[in-house]
C-alpha cells in the first residue's frame, strides 16, 4: 500500500538532457469520452495512465462502452446516447474535475436517476453553475449539499437555451459535449469565459469529429440528433507537464540544453502559450515542429495575464522568483478552485523557502528571491507538488522535503524518473516512516 504521506527528497542540482513528454491528460480524457460516445470501435494510442483516466474509463464503461487495453492502446466500442441501461447507477468521479463536469452534463440525457459522488477532495470543485443550467433545461437535481457532491441527476433535458458561467471553462465544455450528442437542438451563451484555450480545445475536438454547430462570439447553437463516428487517435505530449521539465532546464546552472520531445507545435493545448510567453520575456527557448529546446538563461518578470494558461500559475510563480525584476500574475481567480487554492498554496510554500510571494485576489505579486531548502507540502495538488520540486532543485542551499507527493500521479506518474533523466536530484524519500510522518504534518 502506498503511504498516504509519500514524499520527495530534493537537493540542488543542474538539470539538462532530453526527454519525451508523457501523454496529455486533457486530450486523453476527451479521447476516451468521445470514443465512448461514438458509433463503432475507436482506437486510442498512447493514452495517459493515471487516476483521472482510470476514473473516466470506469464511468464510460458504466455508460455502456466496451473498453479493452492492448499494451499502450485502448480499443473502445462506443455506446451513444440516449442511455437507458447501465451496469450501475452510481458514478464515482474520483478526484477528477473534468470527469465530474463532463459526465454530470451527459447524465442529463438519461431518463433514469444517476448518483454522482467522488473523493472528499472533489467537494471543493464548484459544480453549481452547471447544475443550474441543466435544471433550466429540464433536469431534476436532488440531494444537493453545499452546491457540491453528492447529488442525484435525472433527465432527459429538453431543447432550449441557457446562459452558463464562464468562470471555469469546463462548464461550457460540458454543455458543448452534451449538446453535440443530444437528440434535440440546444444552445447556450457563455458569460465572461475564462480559460478560453481549454474551451477552444473542446471545440477543436468537435470539429475534428465532424460535429456541426454555429458560433457567434460566445454563443453556440447545436442542431441536435448528431452522432460521432469511431476514430483513431494518438495522444500527443502534455504541454502542462512539459512546463515543469522546461523550468528545470531554464533555471539550470548547466551550460547544456534541455530538449523536450513529443510536443507538436500545432497542438491547441492552452499551456503551450506559456513557452511563447517565456520566450518573449527573454528566455532562450526554441520551438520546433515536434520538440522544444530550452537553454539556461535569464529572463525578465512582468505583468502577466494568466487566463490562457491558468494551470501554469504554480510553476510560473517559481520561475518568477528567479526573474530579473518583479512580476504580477493576474486574472487567475479560477486558480483558487482547482485541486487546491493554488494562489494561497504556492505563496505559502514558497515563503517557507524564502520567496517573496504575495497573494492578490486573482493572482500573485512576486519579487526576485533566493530560495533555500525547507519542508514543504503539496496541498494534495499535483501542480503545486511539481512546482515545489523545481523550486527545491534550484534552491541556493539546503535540501527540500516535499510531503504528500502521491498526487503527482494525477497527470505525471513518472515525474521523478523524468527529472532524474534530466540529472535533477529528486528521489522518493526513504527515511524512517514515523519521522517522515512527523515532518510532513
From Swiss-Prot:
It is an enzyme of class 2 (transferase). 3-phosphoshikimate binds at residues 25-26, 30, 169-170, 311, 338. It comes from the Bacteria. Signal peptide: none annotated. Pfam families: EPSP_synthase (PF00275). This is 3-phosphoshikimate 1-carboxyvinyltransferase. It comes from Chlamydia muridarum (strain MoPn / Nigg). Its EC number is 2.5.1.19. The keyword Amino-acid biosynthesis applies. Its main location: cytoplasm. GO terms for biological process: amino acid biosynthetic process; aromatic amino acid family biosynthetic process; chorismate biosynthetic process. Pathway: Metabolic intermediate biosynthesis; chorismate biosynthesis; chorismate from D-erythrose 4-phosphate and phosphoenolpyruvate: step 6/7. Phosphoenolpyruvate binds at residues 25, 97, 125, 170, 342, 383, 410. Monomer. Catalyzes the transfer of the enolpyruvyl moiety of phosphoenolpyruvate (PEP) to the 5-hydroxyl of shikimate-3-phosphate (S3P) to produce enolpyruvyl shikimate-3-phosphate and inorganic phosphate. One of its GO terms (molecular function) is 3-phosphoshikimate 1-carboxyvinyltransferase activity. Belongs to the EPSP synthase family. InterPro entries: Enolpyruvate_Tfrase_dom (IPR001986), Enolpyruvate_Tfrase_sf (IPR036968), EPSP_synthase (IPR006264), EPSP_synthase_CS (IPR023193), RNA3'P_cycl/enolpyr_Trfase_a/b (IPR013792). The active site is at 311 (proton acceptor). Keywords: Amino-acid biosynthesis, Aromatic amino acid biosynthesis, Cytoplasm, Transferase. It catalyses: 3-phosphoshikimate + phosphoenolpyruvate = 5-O-(1-carboxyvinyl)-3-phosphoshikimate + phosphate. It is found in: Cytoplasm.
Amino acid at each position: 500500500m502506498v503511504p498516504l504521506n509519500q514524499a520527495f527528497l530534493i537537493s540542488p542540482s543542474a538539470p539538462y538532457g532530453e526527454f519525451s513528454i508523457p501523454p496529455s491528460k486533457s486530450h486523453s480524457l476527451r479521447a476516451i469520452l468521445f470514443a465512448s460516445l461514438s458509433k463503432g470501435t475507436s482506437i486510442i494510442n498512447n493514452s495517459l495512465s493515471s487516476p483521472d483516466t482510470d476514473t473516466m474509463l470506469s464511468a464510460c464503461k458504466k455508460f455502456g462502452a466496451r473498453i479493452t487495453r492492448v499494451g499502450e492502446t485502448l480499443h473502445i466500442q462506443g455506446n451513444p446516447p440516449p442511455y437507458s441501461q447501465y451496469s450501475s447507477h452510481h458514478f464515482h468521479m474520483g478526484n477528477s474535475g473534468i470527469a465530474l463536469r463532463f459526465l454530470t452534463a451527459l447524465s442529463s440525457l438519461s431518463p433514469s436517476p444517476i448518483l454522482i459522488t467522488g473523493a472528499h477532495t472533489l467537494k471543493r470543485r464548484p459544480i453549481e453553475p452547471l447544475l443550474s443550467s441543466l435544471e433550466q433545461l429540464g433536469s431534476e437535481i436532488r440531494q444537493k449539499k453545499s452546491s457540491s457532491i453528492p447529488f442525484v441527476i435525472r433527465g432527459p433535458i429538453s431543447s432550449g437555451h441557457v446562459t452558463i458561467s464562464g468562470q471555469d471553462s469546463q462548464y461550457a465544455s460540458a454543455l458543448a459535449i452534451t449538446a453535440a450528442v443530444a437528440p434535440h437542438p440546444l444552445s447556450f451563451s457563455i458569460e465572461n469565459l475564462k480559460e478560453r484555450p481549454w474551451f477552444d480545445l473542446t471545440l477543436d475536438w468537435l470539429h475534428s469529429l465532424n460535429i456541426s454547430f454555429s458560433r457567434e462570439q460566445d454563443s453556440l447553437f447545436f442542431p441536435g440528433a448528431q452522432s460521432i463516428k469511431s476514430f483513431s487517435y494518438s495522444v500527443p505530449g502534455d504541454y502542462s507537464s512539459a512546463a515543469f521539465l522546461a523550468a528545470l532546464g531554464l533555471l539550470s546552472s548547466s551550460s547544456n540544453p534541455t530538449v523536450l520531445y513529443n510536443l507538436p507545435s500545432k497542438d491547441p493545448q492552452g499551456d503551450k502559450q506559456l513557452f511563447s510567453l517565456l520566450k518573449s520575456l527573454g528566455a532562450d527557448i526554441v520551438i520546433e515542429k515536434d520538440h522544444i529546446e530550452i537553454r539556461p538563461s535569464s529572463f525578465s518578470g512582468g505583468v502577466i495575464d494568466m487566463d490562457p494558461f491558468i494551470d501554469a500559475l504554480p510553476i510560473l510563480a517559481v520561475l518568477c522568483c528567479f526573474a530579473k525584476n518583479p512580476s504580477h500574475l493576474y486574472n487567475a481567480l479560477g486558480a483558487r478552485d482547482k485541486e487546491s487554492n493554488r494562489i494561497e498554496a504556492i505563496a505559502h510554500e514558497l515563503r517557507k523557502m524564502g520567496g517573496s510571494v504575495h497573494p492578490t485576489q486573482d493572482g500573485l505579486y512576486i519579487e526576485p528571491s533566493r530560495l533555500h531548502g525547507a519542508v514543504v507540502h503539496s496541498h494534495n495538488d499535483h501542480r503545486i507538488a511539481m512546482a515545489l520540486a523545481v523550486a527545491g532543485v534550484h534552491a541556493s542551499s539546503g535540501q527540500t522535503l516535499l510531503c504528500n507527493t502521491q498526487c503527482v500521479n494525477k497527470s505525471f506518474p513518472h515525474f521523478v524518473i523524468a527529472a532524474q533523466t534530466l540529472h535533477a536530484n529528486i528521489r522518493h524519500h526513504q527515511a524512517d516512516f514515523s519521522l517522515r510522518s512527523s515532518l510532513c504534518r
